[in-house]
């Protein structure tokens, strides 16, 4: 995290990826930009006008020639004076230019993400927009890129700002009621407070669901394959991975440990996890594998519950294995996979029973695997035609979850006790957690972690 002294420094870094290329860009930000331009270029270019110029070192030796651009603050990316030198992309040339700039007093190399950090500190970006820059650079799918662009445009920030405004207005109303104790109960019981609070909770819930999808697009969905031994879990892992990742035999209990495969479906990242078959076992090693299987199941974003279609015709989970589903976390999404349809002669397909997706397939022959792939894409939030939702991170989900807890506690106090002061405090804490998302209220340590993960030059 920057200190006040650091913030006064002028910083320099290569803005293009390291290595050889047709063009290499050196970016400078800070009050010494004009001095850099005068010493390396002979004069400072006109604002926002590209000039083709020779680049010199401080001994007036020619280093390169290329395009120079000057953006005076505050009308620049960082909000400070910014100078960009676009020369040839050889690493030696770029290094010579940067070394020449660093000879000027008051200039130092930029830390990772420091240009974006200065943009945030100068109110050119909020925190979600700054994070979207890093996400856009790191993205590996068109859908994720669209989502990152939506965040960069301020889509996520706008939703949070609207929610914060609603919390502030309700908080003002509640605190006004507290200031008039003789009428406080009338204020709190007139239906406006409870109605507005319920609307805010509903709004937060929808944002939270959208943020979860944005997180899955960024980080990838954790898919855990679970079921009884010999249901075909390892065969399904191999079919999705497109290779023989897991050993497959007719012997029940072959898989005793957790197996992981990182795959992409139309560039959407998925983490597929194969687990030991779930059963009572006297074998100590197999017991450990089963315990690990349950650990993975509890951390999953979605569970694929494998069923041997030869053994049961049941469709509903409670009819297949009620004890297993009783142990699943209450909000855990899952899909029932009826495997081995090549042997049971069930038709391949996908349907729903009581809002539970059921896929009929054969992991061994591959029939129905494409249906499963499409289903998983849908679960992640993939759409070939949409402009994408916004991108989100785990810290955003944590902040939203904390905000939701305080809202629900406030509602409980309102309904049970008409406790205006407690409700006002819960609304204050809600506002604080929401502001952490956009950076209105954020600790220096968190900012250091966020911007430290950026690449240098951004």
From Swiss-Prot:
Q: Per UniProt, where does K(+) bind? A: 230, 249, 251, 254
List localization entries. Answer: Cytoplasm
Residues where GTP binds: 230-235, 249-255, 274-277
Give the matching Pfam families. MMR_HSR1 (PF01926), MnmE_helical (PF12631), TrmE_N (PF10396)
Cofactor(s) required, per the database record: K(+)
Any one GO cellular component localisation term in the record: cytosol
EC assignment: 3.6.-.-
What does the record note about the cofactor?
Answer: Binds 1 potassium ion per subunit.
Task: Fetch the PANTHER family from UniProt.
Answer: TRNA MODIFICATION GTPASE GTPBP3 (PTHR42714), TRNA MODIFICATION GTPASE GTPBP3, MITOCHONDRIAL (PTHR42714:SF2)
Which family is it part of? Answer: Belongs to the TRAFAC class TrmE-Era-EngA-EngB-Septin-like GTPase superfamily. TrmE GTPase family.
Name by which UniProt lists this protein? tRNA modification GTPase MnmE
Q: Per the UniProt entry, what species is this protein from, by scientific name? A: Idiomarina loihiensis (strain ATCC BAA-735 / DSM 15497 / L2-TR)
Q: Which gene encodes it?
A: mnmE
């Amino acid at each position: 995290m920057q200190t006040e002294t650091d913030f006064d420094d002028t910083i320099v870094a290569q803005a293009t990826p390291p290595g050889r290329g047709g063009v290499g860009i050196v970016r400078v930000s800070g009050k010494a930009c004009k001095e850099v331009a005068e010493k390396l270029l002979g004069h400072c270019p006109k604002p926002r006008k590209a000039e083709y110029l020779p680049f010199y070192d401080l001994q007036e030796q020619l280093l390169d020639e290329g395009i120079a651009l000057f953006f005076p603050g505050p009308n620049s990316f960082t909000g400070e004076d910014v100078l960009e030198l676009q020369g040839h992309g050889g690493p030696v040339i770029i290094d010579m230019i940067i070394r020449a700039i660093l000879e000027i007093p008051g200039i130092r190399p930029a830390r990772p993400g420091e240009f974006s950090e200065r943009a945030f500190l100068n109110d050119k970006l909020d925190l979600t927009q700054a994070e979207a820059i890093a996400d856009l650079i790191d993205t590996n799918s068109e859908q994720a890129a669209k989502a990152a662009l939506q965040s960069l445009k301020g889509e996520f920030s706008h939703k949070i700002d609207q929610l914060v405004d609603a919390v502030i207005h309700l908080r003002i109303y509640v605190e006004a009621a507290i200031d008039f104790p003789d009428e406080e109960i009338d204020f709190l019981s007139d239906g406006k407070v409870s109605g507005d609070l319920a609307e805010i909770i509903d709004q937060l819930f929808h944002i939270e669901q959208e943020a979860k999808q944005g997180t899955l697009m960024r980080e990838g969905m954790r898919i855990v394959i679970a079921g009884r031994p010999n249901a075909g879990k390892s065969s399904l892992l191999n079919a999705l991975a497109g290779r023989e990742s897991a050993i497959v035999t007719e012997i029940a209990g072959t898989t005793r440990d957790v197996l992981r495969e990182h795959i992409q479906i139309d560039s959407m990242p998925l983490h597929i996890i194969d687990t030991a078959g779930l059963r009572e076992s006297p074998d100590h090693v197999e017991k450990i594998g089963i315990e690990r299987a349950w650990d993975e199941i509890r951390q999953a974003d979605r569970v694929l519950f494998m069923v041997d279609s030869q053994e049961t015709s049941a469709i509903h989970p409670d009819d297949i294995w009620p004890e297993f589903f009783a142990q699943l976390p209450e909000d855990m999404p899952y899909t029932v996979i009826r495997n081995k349809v090549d042997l049971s002669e069930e038709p391949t397909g996908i349907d729903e029973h009581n809002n539970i997706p059921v896929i009929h397939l054969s992991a061994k022959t591959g029939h129905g695997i494409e249906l499963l792939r499409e289903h998983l894409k849908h679960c992640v939030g993939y759409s070939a035609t949409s402009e994408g939702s916004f991108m989100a991170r785990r810290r955003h989900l944590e902040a939203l979850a904390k905000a939701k807890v305080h809202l629900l506690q406030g509602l409980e106090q309102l309904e049970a006790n008409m406790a205006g002061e407690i409700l006002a405090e819960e609304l204050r804490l809600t506002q604080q957690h929401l502001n952490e998302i956009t950076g209105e209220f954020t600790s220096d340590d968190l900012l250091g972690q966020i911007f430290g993960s950026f690449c240098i030059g951004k």
